[in-house]
Amino acid sequence: MKFSIGVSLLATLAGAVNVDMAKRDTSPLNVKLEALGNSGVKAVLTNTGDSDIKLFKTGTFLDKSPVEKVEVFAAGSKIDFDGVRLQISTTGLTEEAFQIVAAGETFEVEFDAAELHDLSKGGAVDIVTQGSFLYADVDSTEIAGTIPFSSNSVHTEINGDEAASVRAAFLAKRTIVQSDCTGTRRTATVNAISRCRALAAAASQAAASGPVARMTEYFKSSTTATRNSVATVFRNIVSECGSTTSGVSRQYCTDVYGACSNGVIAYTVPAQNYMVNCPYFFNNMAAASSTCHAQDQQTTILHEMTHLRQIKGTSDYGGYGYNFVRSLSAAQNLNHADTYTLFAQSIYAGC
């Protein structure tokens, strides 16, 4: 990992498009996508249940930040997402982070898929969105659980030149030069990176030869293939967290991408190999916590590391925390940032 004082910023569902019909049939949230113009998308969310729902917006298609709102496929292959991957706090949230959708209410948002996906080749694409919303009780800001959702698939034809212009205009707004990571923020970040290395080293050993019960608790498998895959991810993190002057990633201590919205602890832009620690990281988090499944600075660094494509290129699937980890399939756990994070944290905390 390298600290940087300036940079020009850019701001799998392998195979065929896969829409989870079970989620669509059982969720109180109905999500319908519509194509707008060349590469625009309208997401229409309807609460089909009989009670109001208070949805956590951050990191979802309701978020105005450059997060992964949709997945885009061309000829059955997923097009890389070039925006931010977030680490979200599940405590200390404010009302601004939520959207209440009344029973029977419909809520619409619009965005452009070309801003964070390279659609310059043009041609036919399929667009979907699926995952989970965190939610709170209507009179609270404490996360109460998750609600899955899955949209329809929209098939549309893209004009590559128009899409390239949209992308170029969006990225031009994201070009910033920033000097940061000094003083106490640098100290906190350096210490967290060092702790991340120790966490990953212990996790790598546990993945390779540790108890079967821990592997199945977090990854739902303890086969040799699963152990090797997980151990490799942690070994990659050991290497990346082993230096603050070399490696594939760059670390920032100020919000160079403008993505530190409510509840965001840190974020990563995998396409550009940089990570940002938000004010919440410095002002609200302990360096380390021995409470099982707690969030802290050391695990935040590890979480963000897994998002790097050279490490693993994980997703969040819209969910964080132990209960969400337990709800995923084995295949999803292998590509879920918080699964790796909580596996490593459980060893540190002796869970």
Curated annotation (Swiss-Prot):
Gene3D superfamilies recorded: 2.60.40.2970, Collagenase (Catalytic Domain) (3.40.390.10)
Residue span(s) of the pro-peptide: 17-177
GO cellular component: extracellular region
Cofactor note: Binds 1 zinc ion per subunit.
Disulfide bonds: C181-C253, C260-C278
Residues making up the signal peptide according to the UniProt record: 1-16
Subcellular location: Secreted
GO terms (BP aspect): proteolysis
Documented EC number(s): 3.4.24.39
Cofactors: Zn(2+)
GO molecular function terms listed in the Swiss-Prot or TrEMBL record: metal ion binding; metalloendopeptidase activity
Catalytic reaction annotation: Preferential cleavage of bonds with hydrophobic residues in P1'. Also 3-Asn-|-Gln-4 and 8-Gly-|-Ser-9 bonds in insulin B chain
Amino-acid positions noted as binding Zn(2+) in the UniProt annotation, renumbered to this chain: H303, H307
Keywords: Cleavage on pair of basic residues, Disulfide bond, Hydrolase, Metal-binding, Metalloprotease, Protease, Secreted, Signal, Zinc, Zymogen
InterPro entries: Fungal_M35_metalloproteases, Lys_MEP, MetalloPept_cat_dom_sf, Peptidase_M35
Enzyme class (EC, first level): hydrolase
Active site, per annotation: E304
Function: Secreted metalloproteinase that allows assimilation of proteinaceous substrates. Shows high activities on basic nuclear substrates such as histone and protamine.
Protein name as catalogued: Neutral protease 2 homolog MGG_10927
Lineage: Eukaryota, Fungi, Dikarya, Ascomycota, Pezizomycotina
